[in-house]
């Protein structure tokens, strides 16, 4: 079974709220399955709060929560802590290295909040074959439900 799937990378931190809103609305209303690498509402709720001390979406909670409700599956990529902090040559946004523990804690807290709201959550560790199977099964189940 094949699906029309598009991959959307984060538009980044330096765009306006209106542009973030348009990016999410446009990509959430497509007929295809859209996979986001960092969804702006989540990215801002965590990185904005930890790195800049402010979530730029705070005043738009209802509207952006409505966008979150259109997401079928949230995949939190969570390898072990030692792999996360093995930066190698990867560039990081300002403040990430100094605040890595707070970022991990906030992403984890948000994953639990979304799960408590009944959202489909998969914590994916790319080093674990079990985690890969769980993610593939979760995606397959959601796609199967949408086809029925």
Q: What function would you assign to each model-found segment?
A:
Residues 36-39, 57-89:
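Conserved phosphate-donor/acceptor-positioning beta-strand/loop module used by diverse small-molecule
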Residues 92-148:
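NTP-dependent small-molecule kinase module
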Residues 30-36, 74, 122:
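Generic beta-sheet signal
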Residues 8-17, 82-84, 128-134:
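A short acidic, often aromatic-flanked loop/helix-cap motif at beta-alpha or helix-coil junctions
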Residues 40-51:
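Oxyanion-hole/transition-state-stabilizing segment in secreted/luminal serine hydrolases
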Residues 16-22, 52-64, 97-108, 136-140:
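Well-ordered, non-membrane alpha-helical segments in soluble/globular domains
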Residues 1-33, 45-46:
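Conserved substrate/cofactor phosphate-moiety recognition/catalytic segment
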Residues 48-50, 85-94:
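Surface-exposed, active-site-proximal loop segments in enzymatic domains
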């Amino acid at each position: 079974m094949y699906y029309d799937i598009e991959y959307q990378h984060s538009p980044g931190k330096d765009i306006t709220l209106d542009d973030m809103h348009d990016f999410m609305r446009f990509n959430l209303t497509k007929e295809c399955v859209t996979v986001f690498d960092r969804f702006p509402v989540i990215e801002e709720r965590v990185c904005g709060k930890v790195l800049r001390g402010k979530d730029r979406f705070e005043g738009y909670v209802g509207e952006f929560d409505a966008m979150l409700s259109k997401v079928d599956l949230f995949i939190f990529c969570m390898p072990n802590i030692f792999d996360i902090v093995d930066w190698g040559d990867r560039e990081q946004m300002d403040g990430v290295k100094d605040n890595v523990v707070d970022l991990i804690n906030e992403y984890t807290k948000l994953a639990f909040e979304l799960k408590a709201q009944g959202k489909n959550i998969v914590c994916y560790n790319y080093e674990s074959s079990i985690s890969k199977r769980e993610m593939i099964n979760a995606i397959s189940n959601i796609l199967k439900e949408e086809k029925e």
